[in-house]
Amino acid sequence: MKILRRIFPFLLLAYHLLFAWIGYQFILTHHGDAERYWFLGQDLSASSWIDFLKPGTDVVKFLSFPLVKFFNLPFWSGFLIFSLLSFAGVLILYRTLMRIAGSNVKLHVLAVVLMLLPNLHFWTSLIGKEALILIPLTVFCAELSRKRYFSVWLLMSLLAVAVIR
C-alpha cells in the first residue's frame, strides 16, 4: 500500500494529462469555450492585455492572452498548461483525502476511486474556469478539514473563487 501511495500521484498526473489530450480532441471536433478563451480565429492586434483584467470569464482570457499574443503558443499547449494548473488542485484534493482517511484502508480505497472519476479530470483539463477554480476550491476544503476557518489561505481561496466566477 505504501508503494501505491508513492506512485499514485504520478499515475494520477498521467491520467489527468490523458484527459487533457481527450479534451483537446473533443474541442477540435465539437468546438467549445476553449476556442474563445484561446482567441482562435480572432485578431488580437487591437487588443491589450489590460482589456481582460475583469472578474469572471475574462480571468481566463487575461491568463491566456500573453501566451497567445506574445508567445504564439499553439492551441494544444493551452490544454497542457491549464491541465497542469488544475492538477495542482487534484493533488491538493488527493492529499487532503488521504490525510482525512488516516489509517483506514477502506477510506484510502474510496479516496483513490473518487480521484479516478473521469469528470474531475475531463472538465478541469480544458482551457477554462474549471481548471482555474479547482485550486482555490481544494485549498478551501483542505483548510476547512484542518479547522483553519480564518486562515489567509482560506480567505485567499474565497477571493480567488469570487474573481474567477
Tell me what each language-model feature is.
Residues F26-L40, W49-S64, N72-L73:
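Extracytoplasmic catalytic/substrate-binding loops of multi-pass membrane glycan-assembly enzymes
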Residues H108-P118:
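Transmembrane and membrane-interface helices of multi-pass
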Residues L80-A101:
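Transmembrane-helix motifs of polytopic, lipid-linked glycan transferases
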Residues M1-L18:
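Start-transfer (signal-anchor) and selected internal transmembrane alpha helices
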